[in-house]
Curated annotation (Swiss-Prot):
GO terms for molecular function: zinc ion binding. Negative regulator of epidermal growth factor receptor (EGFR) signaling. Zn(2+) 1 binds at C910, C913, C934, C937. Residues 310-453, 498-520, 533-640, 747-892 are annotated as: Disordered. Keywords: Metal-binding, Phosphoprotein, Zinc, Zinc-finger. The modification Phosphoserine is found at S537, S538, S808. Residues 563-589, 596-607 have a biased composition (Basic residues). Residues 423-453 have a biased composition (Acidic residues). Residues 327-348, 384-393, 401-422, 629-640, 761-770, 812-866 have a biased composition (Low complexity). Gene3D superfamilies: Zinc/RING finger domain, C3HC4 (zinc finger). It comes from Drosophila ananassae. This is Lateral signaling target protein 2 homolog.
Length: 985
């Protein structure tokens, strides 16, 4: 007992012992003292004292665990439990005091406490927490015993007795504690923050690929600029996620944003928004090329939607020239005159107006059956209308009805590429049909033009279109449902549901009762179905024919083909409806129509392969019809499913009364989802965007910006010659110049100063000589006249050379930025003393205070001293003040480069109080020295004119005290005697 107490006293006396065991002994004793004090009083009675002691307890726990970790590194070595799971942790979790937080959490859980809102996880971790605290207590006892047995003062390594049983017991106890502590770390951190799985990491990589592909596509179509990527434009952090949502839903539909996959397979970043993304996808599929481009442009620029901008009429892009060249009807139709094209264009507007008029009449319950029958007799496009039709929206009547019905109907017929078997030998009917519809248009134009234009203007300036884009406190799901449509998770129906819907659809056709909007929905449905035939597989067509997005130049190459396909598909849509309603209204033909057995099974067009379409395009149509009839019959049910889905998507678009309203809602929802990623997944988004920027930078920029910035002393450094060494009052650290200082062509400041100092005869030769000669600028006995222009130039050259030397040598002499800043201050103070000595010993100066009026530093630019000095010069020697004032003005604008900031990763603790940084104790940089400090040690602010910072900025306390003192002594603050002298004069 006495021996043990003696060893404890002996170990306790040597507090300066730096060995691991001694350091552990003192840290453990301090921790025990704090814990005992905490247990000695009621924390509820003295909350302030309790809080202070708890903070001290956690600091001591950090210290004990840090030393224990060093001991385990030396004793266990490779036997330590692996901690590869830390790669899953977010950046903000991996702090230096993580071990102390884990120990504190384990003690709280072992005592019966629970993590807030994590009761289930706390209950599961409680046995493990109890095992951790018990194992750690055993390790502490064994380490204290080893401190008293085998401690070697100031030993760099542990020198334990390997033959002792206690050493082996310590070894096994450390292994058990290391394993338990690693398990508890993974469990505790996983309960507190989201930890990624392997699948999540893979999905995050796919999200990065999607972002990169989106950026490349945006650069290709002109939405973004390469200079923005090279400059790391902050605006891209918002633009790229928004564009990625659009591209992932409609362009790269089979990528990581494939909404058809199960929800648990989506990335955790987009999993909370799955329902709203499905609705966004369905609406995006109804946009044509121009509308999609306009939406993406708005997502990049946040500009208002241009209501008068021409919107495209096709949601399905025109086929490529190679594909369309196989159709003889298309090539022959390209030779038509402009009158035929004009007639087809008029057909568009006629159908749009009739459909829009039908919807408005049905919505107001004022339409009558005779009126509908009359309209049906006039135009085949109205044969599918019936009093039982129930529209889902009431768009305003207009030539382009607020872009809702017009865009829908024209999108269905604009540039749809029909299969080859759609040419039924009825080309001769088309001219008669066009003439009949043109008559209808002429009758409507005379009465509706003025009313339509006024209504269109009202729709454009509607409140919901002109409102701002940022809508706070908005449910994103409700934004996409302007009508009474419930929001459900089962927005996309399954295959069985779609099949059942198709059967009901066909039954309603047979019964003559149609509930869906007939004309516009059916027209769009068939064209949507045909477009899906062209998109899914890359083996059937070239990539250019599959893409849902093409440049406007590609679509403008084939105007006549698009016009023909518009009219041709329009005829077949009408005949399709005529057949189901048993209303065949044929016009007069030049020859009897050919029989069409395949018309009864027109829904089977989906199964026709594209290869056979191209090969059969050159064959006569009559030879092709019988062979396709059987194939059409076998695939009739498949097309009905797609038709029902397309009609449902079209119905969703019809709920918006204008295209501007639809684009506005899409903007709000897409921007809302993308901006939520900035908040909820900031760390993941930063990593993804950083990778995307690095992958898509230009090669020249990559070579310049990726390497770390090199110090000026490393870039411009050479050995000085004998002429460059200062003769008097100079140290060895002032014998090296920078390359910029030696090169006279780069010395713009000096040239301006010498020119300003001598407006009559600027002596450039003397200025250059004084820049490179030490004797002419700094020697003590050299005489410089106040009125001489070379005197001002010499002082300016002296100031500049000292500033540049201090700047280049400050980084070279010390590794710490704060040390270089203090050396810079000392250099400037020595410069002021030398200038004052030079001015006092000069012949032309009669007053010792003249130096205050010709300061060569921006810190001496005091209005009071300059005014008093100029008055004294006028009274003493009546000399001009222009050289001196020019020198002051010139040097006042010459500022230093701000110091380089110490990286956050190299400063785990405050450089003043040595307090470790945490997620709550943030880092702050001093603008004067570049050091990293906590908020308490850097709560001062002061202007730094030497760096060009005239406003107060954050500085540490040491720099603040130094700047205030130097400002009082260097900046020329007048004394009481000087103020009295200036007042008397």
């Amino acid at each position: 007992m006495n021996g043990s107490g003696g060893r404890q006293m002996q170990c306790g006396k040597k507090a300066d012992d730096k060995s691991l065991l001694a350091r552990f002994f003192h840290a453990d004793r301090s921790l025990t003292a704090v814990a005992s004090e905490l247990d000695s009083f009621d924390g509820r009675a003295e909350p302030d004292r309790c809080t202070r002691l708890v903070s001290k307890l956690r600091l001591n726990q950090d210290k004990v665990l840090a030393i224990t970790n060093l001991i385990m590194e030396e004793l266990l070595g490779e036997d330590r439990d692996p901690r590869a799971f830390r790669a899953k942790f977010p950046e903000e979790v991996l702090q230096e005091n993580l071990a102390g937080q884990l120990w504190f959490g384990a003690e709280c859980l072992a005592a019966g406490s629970s993590i807030m809102n994590r009761e289930a996880e706390s209950k599961e971790m409680r046995p493990l927490a109890q095992a951790v605290t018990k194992s750690l207590g055993n390790v502490r006892v064994l380490l204290r015993d080893q401190c008293l047995r085998n401690n070697v003062p100031n030993s760099k390594t542990l020198q334990l007795d390997l033959n002792d049983s206690t050493t082996e017991q310590l070894y096994e106890s450390l292994k058990i504690f290391d394993r338990l502590f690693a398990e508890f770390e993974l469990s505790y951190v996983s309960a507190m923050v989201q930890v990624k799985s392997r699948h999540e990491y893979e999905m995050q990589q796919w999200i990065g690929v999607l972002f990169s592909e989106t950026l490349q596509r945006a650069l290709k179509i002109g939405l973004l600029d390469q200079d923005m990527v090279d400059a790391f434009d902050p605006g891209l952090m918002f633009s790229i996620p928004r564009l990625a949502i659009v591209a992932g839903l409609v362009v790269y539909a089979k990528g990581p944003l494939n909404m058809d996959m199960p929800g648990d397979q989506l990335s955790e970043m987009f999993r909370p928004f799955r329902t709203i993304l499905i609705k966004i996808r369905d609406l995006l599929r109804n946009l044509n090329h121009e509308e999609l481009y306009q939406l993406e442009k708005v997502l990049c620029t946040n500009e208002d939607i241009n209501a008068k901008a021409p919107l495209g009429s096709s949601s399905i892009e025109a086929p490529s020239p190679e594909h369309s060249s196989h159709h003889p009807t298309t090539s022959s139709n390209n030779n038509n005159n402009n009158g035929d094209t004009t007639g087809t264009t008029n057909t568009h507007r006629t159908v749009e107006r009739l459909v829009d008029q039908r919807n408005n009449n049905n919505n107001n319950n004022t339409s009558s059956a005779p009126a509908l029958d009359k309209a049906a007799n006039r135009s085949p496009s109205m044969l599918s209308l019936s009093p039982n039709s129930t529209p889902t929206a009431s768009p305003a009547p207009s030539p382009t009805p607020s872009h809702s019905i017009a865009s829908t109907s024209s999108s269905a017929t604009g540039s749809t590429h029909p299969p080859a078997d759609w040419s039924d030998g009825d080309d001769e009917d088309e001219e008669d049909d066009d003439d009949d519809i043109e008559v209808e248009e002429e009758e409507l134009d005379s009465t509706d033009d003025e009313t339509d234009e006024e209504q269109l203007l009202k729709d454009i300036v509607a409140a919901d279109c002109a409102s701002g884009y940022l809508i706070p406190n908005t449910n994103l799901g409700n934004l996409l449902q302007p009508q009474e449509v419930p929001l459900t998770d089962n927005f996309v129906a399954s295959e069985d549901d779609e099949y059942g819907a198709g059967e009901q659809q066909r039954q309603r056709h047979r019964d003559g009762q149609e509930d869906e909007p007939s004309t516009s929905a059916a027209m769009l449905a068939a064209s949507r179905t045909l477009q899906r035939l062209r998109l899914p597989s890359s083996d059937a067509e070239p990539l250019a024919e599959q893409s849902t997005i093409k440049t406007p130049e590609q679509e403008q190459d084939q105007p006549h083909q698009s016009v023909y396909r518009h009219r041709h598909s329009h005829r077949h849509h009408h005949r399709h409806h005529h057949h189901h309603h048993q209303r065949h209204h044929h016009h007069q033909h030049q020859q009897p129509p050919q029989p069409h057995p395949h018309r009864t099974t027109r829904s089977g067009r989906k199964r026709c392969s594209l290869d056979s379409t191209e090969s059969e395009a050159t064959q006569p149509e009559r030879d092709r019809e019988p062979s396709q009839a059987s194939g059409d019959t076998s695939a009739a049910s498949s097309l009905s499913d797609d038709v029902s889905l397309a009609m449902r998507n079209t119905t969703a678009r019809l709920k918006f009364k204008s295209t501007e309203n639809l684009l506005h809602r899409l903007f709000v929802c897409i921007a809302g989802v993308a901006d939520q990623l900035q908040t909820n997944f900031a760390s993941d988004l930063r990593q993804i965007l950083r990778s995307v920027f690095l992958m898509n930078m230009s090669s020249a920029q990559e070579e310049i910006d990726i390497p770390e910035k090199t110090k000026e002393s490393e870039l411009f450094e050479f050995r000085a010659s004998e002429n460059d060494v200062i003769q008097e009052s100079a140290g060895s650290n002032q014998s090296i110049y920078s390359a910029e200082e030696v090169n006279p062509e780069l010395d713009n400041v000096f040239s301006a100063g010498s020119g300003g100092g001598s407006p009559g005869n600027g002596n450039q030769a003397n200025a250059s000589a004084q820049r490179h000669s030490a004797g002419g600028s700094i020697q003590r006995n050299n005489t410089v006249d106040d009125g001489s222009p070379t005197g001002g130039g010499a002082l300016l050259a002296t100031s500049r050379s000292h500033v540049m030397r201090s700047r280049s040598l400050g980084d070279q002499e010390s590794a710490s930025t704060s040390t270089s800043s203090s050396q810079l201050h000392q250099e400037q103070q020595q410069l002021q003393i030398q200038v004052q000595r030079q001015r006092n010993n000069s012949v032309g100066s009669n007053t010792p205070s003249s130096a205050s009026s010709t300061s060569s530093s921006s810190e001496q630019n005091s209005p009071v001293s300059a005014r008093s000095g100029s008055r004294r010069r006028l009274q003493s020697n009546n000399e001009t003040q222009m050289p001196s004032s020019a020198t002051v003005t010139t040097t006042a604008t010459a500022t230093l480069a701000p110091p380089a900031w110490i990286p956050d990763g190299k400063a785990p603790r405050c450089m003043s109080c040595q307090t470790p940084f945490t997620a709550f104790r943030r880092r702050h940089h001093c603008r004067n020295c570049g050091g990293v400090f906590c908020g308490v040690c850097s709560n001062a602010s002061a202007p730094l004119p030497k760096y060009g910072l005239t406003k107060a900025v954050r500085v540490c306390r040491e720099c603040y005290v130094r700047e205030v003192r130097s400002g009082m002594s260097v900046q020329g603050v007048p004394s009481v005697q000087e103020r009295l002298t200036a007042t008397a004069s």
